[in-house]
A protein has these predicted regions:
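Mg2+/Mn2+-dependent nuclease catalytic core
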Residues: 60-150
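Metal-dependent nuclease catalytic cores that hydrolyze phosphodiester bonds in DNA/RNA
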Residues: 1-82, 108
Length: 150
């Protein structure tokens, strides 16, 4: 009998990258609301080739499991030469510190979106852009990556 799993990208990345038992990410209602506002503002300022809140899903078959993975990429930048998944992160801590401490989680999440987009559009290579925005300062930092399907 085939076992079926339905997972969000968030659930998958949390499970795969879980280490220890302390989660040092900062979550509170005020910070989350401000993050939502910053995401929407940032997305509204992007060019017409920027697809905000892009819904993705893919089915994977592993052993006797059917896994449906789904999630919503913050943005997809559609270019002729390279599609780029934009993952936006807002924080109240130093951007370099935040990136260094959370890079594996952020890249893992973006890689899932990139793979699903590549499968949907039959692409061999997809770019990833991690966009970090400070919630109280006017600071932004961008990290770029390129991945190919293997």
């Amino acid at each position: 009998m085939d076992k079926r799993l339905k997972l969000s990208v968030h659930q998958l990345v949390d499970f795969v990258l879980r280490t220890g038992d302390i989660d040092n990410r900062i979550f509170n209602r005020s910070s989350m609301n401000e993050g939502t506002r910053i995401h929407a503002f940032y997305q509204s300022k992007q060019s017409s080739n920027y697809l905000s809140e892009y819904l993705l899903g893919a089915t994977f078959y592993v052993d006797d499991f059917t896994i449906f993975l789904e999630g919503r990429a913050d943005g997809i930048i559609v270019n002729d030469d390279l599609a780029i998944v934009d993952e936006i992160k807002s924080t109240v801590v130093d951007l370099e510190d935040y990136h260094r401490e959370q890079e594996a989680w952020h890249v893992g999440q973006a890689k899932c979106y990139a793979l699903m987009y590549a499968l949907e559009k039959n692409l061999e290579t997809v770019g990833i852009r991690l966009t970090y925005i400070h919630q109280t300062k006017n600071d932004k930092m961008v990290k770029n990556y390129v991945f190919t399907q293997e």
